[in-house]
């Protein structure tokens, strides 16, 4: 279980609490600059929180424990920095998401899909996210098109 209890991060996020169990998806929504990606970075242990706590399966996420927890997570960023020769944003993003879903990790953290994705690509994203949920993974995503189980910032 992923739990956030009264999490505060900078000026963007104040006293956010939520819980996510195995086989559940939560979609983070909000306007530009509202802290969506900041929250994902805190869940990954990349940035510290200013208040409250985050726990995974009852264990607190701290700067010391973050590397351990990241081994249980798969992260798909919004924008990819790819080697020269990779030109198709959509297929690269879909390949990275497929790898994350197939990794068997217990927690998938998926930032907003690139704007370049087609309607068909977005359906593939939705299908892969639901596949991960059905497998029992916890999925935290930022996706303005995926309307199930939203948390607005």
Regions found by a protein language model. Name each.
Residues 75, 80-88:
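Conserved catalytic motifs of ABC-family nucleotide-binding domains
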Residues 52-60, 69:
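Conserved ABC transporter NBD signature motif
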Residues 44:
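Helix-to-loop junction immediately C-terminal to a conserved catalytic motif
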Residues 114-117:
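Short loop immediately C-terminal to the Walker-B catalytic DE motif
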